[in-house]
UniProtKB/Swiss-Prot annotation:
Chain positions recorded as ATP binding sites: 214, 233, 249-257, 298, 334, 450-451, 456
Protein name (Swiss-Prot/TrEMBL): Phosphoenolpyruvate carboxykinase (ATP)
Regions annotated as coiled coil: none
Catalyzed reaction equations: oxaloacetate + ATP = phosphoenolpyruvate + ADP + CO2
Subcellular location: Cytoplasm
Amino acid sequence: MTVMEHTKAAQIDLAQYGITGVTELVRNPSYEMLFAEETRSDLEGYERGVVTELGAVAVDTGIFTGRSPKDKFIVKDDTTRDTLWWTSDKAKNDNKPINQEVWNDLKALVTKQLSGKRVFVLDGYCGANADTRLSVRFITEVAWQAHFVKNMFIRPSEEELAHFKPDFVVMNGAKCTNAKWKEHGLNSENFTVFNLTERMQLIGGTWYGGEMKKGMFAMMNYFLPLQGIASMHCSANMGKAGDVAIFFGLSGTGKTTLSTDPKRALIGDDEHGWDDDGVFNFEGGCYAKTIKLSKEAEPDIYNAIRRDALLENVTVRSDGSIDFDDGSKTENTRVSYPIYHIDNIVKPVSKGGHATKVIFLSADAFGVLPPVSKLTPEQTKYHFLSGFTAKLAGTERGITEPTPTFSACFGAAFLTLHPTQYAEVLVKRMEAAGAEAYLVNTGWNGSGKRISIKDTRGIIDAILDGSIEKAETKHIPIFNLQVPTALPGVDPMILDPRDTYVDPLQWESKAKDLATRFINNFDKYTDNAEGKALVAAGPKLD
């Protein structure tokens, strides 16, 4: 075996993972080498990247253009039996169990796929705090998957690589599938499986890079809260005075737009922890959606798409230009890039002090939630566990009906412990830091229009500069929320959602409809004492 290294690091023996006969091991290659490797003319199919006019390489991820939650399984053993939030009839989630025998079969499949090949080994960190980060070793035979890892995880220095000992190993066998999936009781021939005792993730059949990113997020969501550290699906930024704010929100709520603020430096856009020192990013890069991307609307992301960025599933014309409006492969077109492609970031390490403002973003298509409410600690837990947003979906008669989405902790797909554990840890961290929480509706109101970005930015500014704390408040029934009566730069007529309706009874009817959905959704958290105690903090129909 030859070892091609761009570091002074010690040699790696892959036989310890069951991978044998490797013809060449390429460890932590430079961006220049990755560019040359992923654009080689002899590559075929999904392995081959094309160079775009912006300088970034574009690849296709095949039939999987997003994560495949139905193919996610975790080994149920003495480590996980009593700690993991397993799927159940009452609370269905993506944490489905497999036994050790199935794991052994899948591991044999992946190691066979990677054996006798030229492989890339990428060592990186998940977590910007040295005390709690995961040292992760990724093994793949596909150059662009190594590139994705280099973009998205924190890149070790040469000195750190020389002494690198992985806490977790990810073996990506994208080219292999499992013919015995029915016998194994799995969902399909593709698989993304985890073993927390062996501290390993196996991937087969899917080429989607996000399985590696979100796989490690799910693992941080297991290890950190058990140590009393908050693990959060949120963006975070920092003001000039060092004040930190975190933004939770599901897709389409404005999380990226509102946390990208010229007055504030970005800590990170998606995954963070909160420990005794403050808020820290898990990642070394960003994974941004590119559908309908334009330089005018989102200059930061557009300008980040250059050499070393990696585009996924976009349409590249024959002249190398990109059609960002084309969603024919998927609406989930993406780009990964190292975080330093964004100018206004916290340097040199993506971390800040303790958060003083915690913002939950919901796009309420029912049109009844206030544009901003200040939450009590109990309400913070309730709305964090609810993780509400809603979209407008057309029906066959052309009427637009709101479709609610409730996703625990604004990231249910990535939770590995019971949701109440994340809520408890978050509120403890908030109380210790004296942080305030706010529920911000970036959706609709009684006018039938979406709340303007100008008003929403005015609300966020009022939260961040503290002026909302000086405002008089009033009580909104049914949802049991306190709202300000006036804020600088915000239309006062929208702050009480009832004022946006010609007929206040229409608001009441819609509000009761949404409140009922909140109550029904929250029922699944009443299987423990913590959840039962929070029911009183939610909406009330009497």
